[in-house]
Amino acid sequence: MKVIGLLFSFVFFAIKCKSETIEVYNDLIQKLEKLESLSVDGLELFQKSQVIINATQPTETIDPFTNHNFAQQVQDFVTKFEGLGFTEQTELVNLIKALTPNRYGVKYLIESKEEFNGLMHAINFYYDVLRDKLNDMCANNYCEIPEHLKISEEETEMLKKVILGYRKPIENIQDDIEKLEIYIERNKETVAALNALIAEETKKIQPEGNEDCNDASCDSDKYNKKKPIYQAMYNVIFYKKQLAEIQKVVEVLEKRVSTLKKNDAIKPLWQQIEVLNAAPVVTAETQIVTGGQSSTEPGSGGSSASGTSSSGQASAGTGVEQANTVASVTVTPSVGQNGEASTNPQTAQVQPVPTLTLEEKQKKIAGLYAQIKEIAKTIKFNLEGIFVDPIELEYFKKEKKKESCNLSTSSCKKNKASETIIPLTIRYPNGISYPLPENDVYNKIANNAAETTYGDLTHPDNTPLTGDLATNEQARKDLIKAIKKKIKAEEKKLETLKTNYDNKLTEFNQQKTPFKEAAKEFYESKFRNKLTSEIFEKFKTKRDEYMTKKTELNTCEYGNTKELINKLNKQLNYLQDYSLRKDIISNEIEYFSNKKKELQYNINRLAEAVQAKQNVLVASKDVPLSTLVELQIQKSLLTKQIEQLNKTEVSLNKAQLKDKLYVPKTYGNEGKPEPYYLIAVKKEVDRLAQFIPKIESMIAKEKERMEQGPAITGESEEVPSGPSAESSTDRSTQSSTSSSSSSSSTPAAAESSSATLPEAPAPAEAASPSTEASEETTIPPTTQETQPSQAASSTTPAKPVMTKLYYLEKLQKFLVFSYSCHKYVLLQNSTINKDALSKYALTSEEDKIRTLKRCSELDVLLAIQNNMPTMYSLYESIVDGLQNIYTELYEKEMMYHIYKLKDENPSIKSLLVKAGVIEPEPVAAPTPVTPAATEQQQQQATPDVQSDAPAPSDVSQQPETPVTSTTPEVTTSTEASSSAPGEGTPSGEAGASGTEGATASNAATPAGTSASGSAASNASTTSDVTPPAAAAAVPSTSTPAPAQPPAANSQSGNPDSGIRSRAESEEDMPADDFELDNLYKSYLQQIDGNNTEFINFIKSKKELIKALTPEKVNQLYLEIAHLKELSEHYYDRYSTYKLKLERLYNKHEQIQLTNRQIRDLSILKARLLKRKQTLNGVFYILNGYVNFFNKRREAEKQYVDNALKNTDMLLKYYKARTKYFTSEAVPLKTLSKASLDRESNYLKIEKFRAYSRLELRLKKNINLGKERISYVSGGLHHVFEEFKELIKDKDYTGKKNPDNAPEVTNAFEQYKELLPKGVTVSTPAVAVTTTLAADAPATPEGAVPGAVPGAVPGAVPGAVPGAVPGSGTDTRVAGSSVDDNEDDDIYQIASGQSEDAPEKDILSEFTNESLYVYTKRLGSTYKSLKKHMLREFSTIKEDMTNGLNNKSQKRNDFLEVLSHELDLFKDLSTNKYVIRNPYQLLDNDKKDKQIVNLKYATKGINEDIETTTDGIKFFNKMVELYNTQLAAVKEQIATIEAETNDTNKEEKKKYIPILEDLKGLYETVIGQAEEYSEELQNRLDNYKNEKAEFEILTKNLEKYIQIDEKLDEFVEHAENNKHIASIALNNLNKSGLVGEGESKKILAKMLNMDGMDLLGVDPKHVCVDTRDIPKNAGCFRDDNGTEEWRCLLGYKKGEGNTCVENNNPTCDINNGGCDPTASCQNAESTENSKKIICTCKEPTPNAYYEGVFCSSSSFMGLSILLIITLIVFNIF
């Protein structure tokens, strides 16, 4: 199907989030104001006489020799324009600036006028284009357009005609190849003519004679000579501008023609035209008719052409470049994918054309051209390439987009026209928050601005704020005083400023209307070329007055002062509120901090006990089972304690966030401006509203088509079109990916069966055969995890369902949900005027869809989520909302507790009296006797008040009482909350105050009631000391419904929630369940009665507190519960948005980093390829050294090949990494710390795999480096031996090849120990030279005598230019391209030795060229070998270091991924393990996995140890061999110094610089080798330590597994091991580390037994004093304290205190082992052995250890609470 592949890409053509920041708007306004000023000033300065129709000609022109002001005015004017940055006019501006200082130049400019007119044309053009841009930007009153910058419709239309009409001729012929070619040829002629004109004008420009004219010597003759030069300078600029435009046109049109001719459908048609043009023309009588063709038909091409034409017309609008396949039926019956013609031989064959008459020929050609034109219409032509000016190009794109909207079937234009435009100030009564620029957002995220700054808080004196403002109370008080002082000072000025402002505003408004009229008249007359001097002067006057008044109004301080006072008041209110709630927050932080310390202390004690037992068990051969049980219980408790610690850490983080001093942008009752993210959401809603009808229309047409044409099958539609719509897929690849991710993450419970299929595969399968862009889209692991689990098991066949209609319907469902969701988010959070917002009200169907899929802010499109400014707006809105919630929650909590305590606590009553809330009590009068009836009435009234605080037991006994018919609104709200709990809570509700506001809030927010209900449930069931929470639980029948009924309803769906909180102990209780009511109560009870701040707070709430009644208190409690839930909701959003922003920031950083890696690797690859080419060059080498250089060259070739392969691998890896980050999307709905950790692990594994592929070649390169060092070392040895021969005989010229072979062999043998294993040195032979010479070209002229006539490579990686291994100083490398930049040492290639320092000339003594020919050639060879040695030595060090580092990094990444399973045991705040050895807490499967992976890591360490050891051995051997050679060099120097013959000594001393240099080389290499060997030794020690740690950990894990296996055996035989469990419980109770109830719960869960079974030995019957209890025995403590141990059944007492197995137990002996009071019975067991059954009788009916002991007391003597706890634990 042609459309399906493009469907999901086309969907999001309009769904893109565009950020227009306030900076963009301000910059545009500033630029336009400058352009407006230049336009008016320029008309006055340059064009007055040209534009104004009745302008009087000046009596005399401006004379630059007498008028010195004009030149300065021009300079200032041009400088202002240059500052605007319009680069296309740079040459013209520079010309005017160059001519203005010269009086001749000024005179020319005045006379010519062309330069000024050109500049003014550009200014007016930019002014109009940018005014039009501002007009579009501020459409629908999105922003305000200043009066003097508005543009009329006439001007807009004219601008469109000028820019679009100028390119219209090209658009008219863009599909006609014939006309395009003619047009191209004509423009090429124009290009040639312009080039000739430019060359001609350039010749006229003479550099001489450009001096200025400043005296009387200036005359007209000199000016007449200069004028043609000035004119030529302008002409060159003018012609170049035209040339650039025409060349762009030619380039674009040639590309267009080439694209059309290469098209698979057009190509055969074009071939037919060429054949027809070349065919002869005859008369009609002689024409030949082809076989099988009617004589009346013009030809096969003609008939097929007509069919093709209609086919092309039918499919013209289906895609951007789909027409590549259309019309190919002319010669091919079918077309393959991507527009490639079928391989049928008939398709590639152009049939022979019959000879036609001229008329027939022309008609046939015209028909073919018509077909081509129809096909070309469907192939996209990008006209944007012809534009030179970017401002003009931007306008063209904008207008073309508008045209496409107007031409489409959508109602975008109609909707805009019919929409009632509401002014911006009315639409957004509180204004708009514009987004921050992206770079500012990145900086804020990098610096964690929300947590490291004080928000919108500044010191009134503009001094820096202290860093301890949150903790330093005095600093806050000082700041509050300073703010109050500043407010008073500013308010004093405000009245005067207000009067001044009103006066200036009145004056400005008075000038506004006259200016508008004058401006309208001016621009209209100028537009119609009817501008008169009167109109212009009037406009100038009114404009000057208007701009003056506008400037005065803008500079008025009233507005700024008022804003400053509002800001200061906001800061003051916040600081005062913060100071009030600071004590409560501090207490909360202290509570959770203490709880954390307590947990950490318990964890440390448990961890030490666990480790001690673990060590004992590891070291012991015989492990007591009771100790195993104790260990397992402690480990289980340790895990739970760590979980509890992390929960407490989360609660502590929440409390610390409350403690964060952060002044929001809006606070309290201040009007909140519309957040930018809601503006983005509104745009998406508007776009979806336009797009959904189009999809519905497509669905209707598709259904109609399927009904009309049932014969059309999916197979016919599977024939894909030509090259797919690359433009649409490129625009929306990420959006389509995001659509699938978003849609797949929203379950549709009520959809049809087809709707349950995953959304993601649909676009992927559809787009894969047609677009490259979609193939490159990578779906990350985090996105894959959002797919429904049932996707893989779907039974619906894929092919029958994958139809165009199926796709359209799925798309429509997703868009409808997205539309409903975005509308809901907008409705819940927007501050838009109600009338404007009513347009977006949800229909009943939309609300149903939204409710079923539980829409929230997390469902916004990825285009919004992945936009940094928009996402930061979401985050900032949540941060501000949290601060408001914290304050409101404090106020309501305080009022609630004040009301509750006012009658109980005298100090509270005293505070209320001081604040004037209640009247002081009158003096007590004698109490009269109360009649019985009155007392009875009081008793009846008392429950109405006291029922607000019932006992927890009362609550549990009356769960259904509040659910009555008197509370329908609450019940309804509760039912609604079940569908969307807390997802769409409006942020504005957090600011509601008062009971009336809360009622409205709860009515609008279903989640509020459910949230408060759960809070009340927790309050009433978790603690006996929470009267405030329980107070509203059971109200009187006359009160509104409290929080309890929703809690009851919510518990019915999840019975765990209420019961578990009762059953758990305080240690096991989640930290979040701790009720903070006691903090408020304690604070109020301890507050100082003279606390003026708190008294002022009570005064501010005086009326609200007075109005409180029991009913309103219940309502207040509901509001508090709702705010608590809302704060949790906001905190979750805060954490998620923060993670998202950090994710986007890290993604941005990773993309930049990876791009740098790709750039560096690309440079490295280019240099390696260049080096590879160099290695194949031609070199001339001194005879006798061919083998050294040849072997080194061969090793170098392999080295470069390996490096290239590794570089290609790394490039592939980093490109895939970049692709992953750019295409991957992390939806908010699935974003979490865990998902980011999984992503991080995925990336580490990918890096691990990439590095693993490099290892083998890195190892090979190290070995190749050893080879090269060995060969170069041999060459140096041979050089030294040759110099020794020269010292003996200065006439020595070297040995011939046969005689030289043994010496070469000896040189190789000297350093063969440096070769890697498996590499041997082949003995050089005479044939070596012969072979080289055979393949070599003839020795070129000028070759040095004695050189080997062969091409012997000698270049190395990093060879320095000039370092030529030749046979003489004049010998050069032939055909080499040596890389002269060797500083890039990325991964494989090491940098060479720095050659910046000047090199000492060691051959300076040998001045006679003819006498020392061989010496100088040998010296050059030595220089080359020396450079090779230094470079090879540096390279092998770098390769070895990089190889070891890569493996270490790979191993570390592997271990980090491995340790991910231990994250549960990390402290959230420090990211460190809570205990030292977290491995012991893993289960067996994970331990096995850890062992396998640790063994793999150990294997890697062994390889590193082997590599390092081999490296140490190599460098030590290198030092040893070089020391021997160094000693020989020193000896030779000493021999020369000791020479007695003066003549010989002077001759030999010439060689001392060479020998000293060789000595220095050896000393340098030896020193560096020893240093690196020591470094490798340190690495080796570290590797051994690391290996030892891994081995110890592996052994410990194996021991842990053995212990766990024994424990598993114990669990399997739990029924027989109850006594062991009892012993373990007893020991644990004695230790004090584990509570009695806690240990039994853990043991019950571990043994999978009923908790009561573990009470076989009650704690009071557990032995305390008896220590030496043998194995297979049980100990019992009587009620009187007597302790006794007895052997268990099946065992008997042996020698000493032991119990041995009893193979034949009988009741006759020792009562069979039963208690003496018990009855004993013999029974046959399944193993044909006897078994004893003991039965305890009254008065001791309770059996212990299967009747070995009998007692009168049983488990029923235990605490009833413990029994209930165990029962509940086993049930749930």
UniProtKB/Swiss-Prot annotation:
Residue positions with a glycan: N54, N406, N646, N829, N1018, N1090, N1408, N1446, N1541, N1629, N1680
Disordered: annotated span: 290-319, 703-796, 924-1070, 1362-1383
Membrane topology: Lipid-anchor; GPI-anchor
Keyword Cell division recorded: no
Alphabetized SUPFAM superfamilies for the sequence: EGF/Laminin
Keywords: Cell membrane, Disulfide bond, EGF-like domain, Glycoprotein, GPI-anchor, Lipoprotein, Malaria, Membrane, Merozoite, Repeat, Secreted, Signal
Post-translational modification: The p230 precursor is cleaved by SUB1 prior to merozoite egress into 4 subunits p83, p30, p38, and p42 which remain non-covalently associated. In a second processing step during erythrocyte invasion, p42 is cleaved by SUB2 into p33 and p19; the latter remains attached to the merozoite surface via its GPI-anchor and stays on the surface during the subsequent ring stage.
Biological processes, Gene Ontology terms: mRNA 3'-end processing
Domain EGF-like per the UniProt entry, residue ranges: 1661-1703, 1704-1752
Signal peptide extent: 1-18
Pro-sequence residue ranges: 1752-1772
Manganese in keyword set: no
Lipid tethering residues (GPI-anchor amidated serine): S1751
Cystine pairings recorded for this chain: C1663-C1675, C1687-C1699, C1707-C1720, C1714-C1734, C1736-C1750
Organism domain of life: Eukaryota
GO MF entries: RNA polymerase II complex binding
Listed Low complexity bias regions: 305-319, 724-796, 930-946, 956-1052
Complex and partners: Forms a complex composed of subunits p83, p30, p38, and p42 which remain non-covalently associated; the complex is formed at the merozoite surface prior to egress from host erythrocytes.
Function of the protein: During the asexual blood stage, involved in merozoite egress from host erythrocytes possibly via its interaction with the host cytoskeleton protein spectrin resulting in the destabilization of the host cytoskeleton and thus leading to erythrocyte cell membrane rupture. Involved in the binding to host erythrocytes and is required for host erythrocyte invasion.
Descriptive protein name: Merozoite surface protein 1
Source organism (scientific name): Plasmodium yoelii yoelii
Lineage: Eukaryota, Sar, Alveolata, Apicomplexa, Aconoidasida
